[in-house]
Amino acid sequence: MTLAQEMTLLGQKAKEAARLLAKASPAAKNAALTRLAALLEEREAELRTANAQDLDAARARGLDAPRMDRLTLHPAVLADMRAACLHVAGLPDPVGAMDSQWQRPNGLLVGRMRVPLGVIAMIYEARPNVTIDAAILCLKAGNAVILRGGSEALHSNTALAALLRQALEEAGLPADAAQLVTTTDHAAVTELCKLDQYIDVMIPRGGEGLVRAVTEAATMPVLKHYKGVCHAFVDADADLDKALDIVFNGKVQRPGVCNALECLLVHKDCAAAFLPRVGRRLGEAGVEFRACPASLPLLGPTAKAQSPDDLGQEFHALVLAVRVVDDMDEALAHIARYGSNHTEIICTNNHEHAMRFLREADASMVAVNASTRFNDGGQLGLGAEIGISTSKLHAYGPMGVQELTTTKFVVFGQGQVRQ
């Protein structure tokens, strides 16, 4: 069987599974999710063994520390996966829900009903937990999913996909509602991108190169999880103690993730008071600063002169670009030029400035006096997320269960005919 035939077969199986899953009862879907949570606990030793194989191979290839962290199924990550299964099982089922209803003058009752998208192809890189996060959301929303993870996580993803299929079968649902692409041939993604007769939506989640390649090749709609160039603007009248905690959390907690802070913008009126504190606290945590001329002498020994390439950069590391700005106009102009529509935050005690920033900063999440790290489906109350969309059509921001459905019009009549 050729690669094209293999991918076509996956698509055909997924399309049929999606048809069956769309009419599955909420109880059956929730039973599969609950069983999956139990299997993740019962088979944890097997999962850790599979993950160790991936980690050993990654070390041998010299994978960097942030990517090793994303690849690792830490105990906390496994616990979060189990919790996500149970949380999503407890969410209201969106399928069949009526978003709105109204009556026309001729007596027709018109409504909008939530329905699954159909078949979703998820293309992602080093994080094996995405296998579970993506599948459980697709399942809850009545969608079949084709999963194509990175080659570095193949053993982990294969073990997780086996549990997914077991949970589906035990709940009386089609196992083909969750299929994993097991070939590491990059051409598999190209072949999937051609299958618009079977795949309804493509979701790439990973590096900029992956997202661009899928977007350019896909013959079906793409929900882009693009890069996270996240900014924090510390306004002149910010609470500097809170701002320091927010900046530290955004950069240091998990520097390799998409909602990590990448660029700090500081109002010139508080730069002298704030930046030395940033330099000490973040510098002690190992952060290297890429500093503009005004901030360079204020940040201490871990600061280096900024190059043009440092702006708009997703570092995936303990590196932070820093720039002093004259006012909010300059901060917003910087974000408009270098941001990636992911996450932007302001630290300020000025309500007018806060509201202006919320209106004008163009991102899927904009926050006041809170860390960039909160742009996450779980943190925003959506349960697990399939990704953070930086596209504005269909979904913008973390994509939970609701975002994996669409609406169709339903009409109730009593024999009306159009005049």
Task: List the predicted regions and their residue ranges.
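Rossmann-like NAD(P) dinucleotide-binding subdomain of oxidoreductase/dehydrogenase enzymes
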Residues: 90, 98-241
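ALDH superfamily catalytic-core signature
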Residues: 126-127, 133-144, 159, 163, ...
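Flexible, glycine/charged-enriched surface loops at secondary-structure junctions
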Residues: 24-30, 95, 171-178, 254-260, ...
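Conserved C-terminal structural/oligomerization subdomain of aldehyde/semialdehyde dehydrogenase
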Residues: 117, 307-419
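A structural signal for short, well-ordered beta-strand elements
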Residues: 22-23, 236, 324, 347
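N-terminal Rossmann-like NAD(P)+-binding subdomain of aldehyde/semialdehyde dehydrogenases
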Residues: 1-109
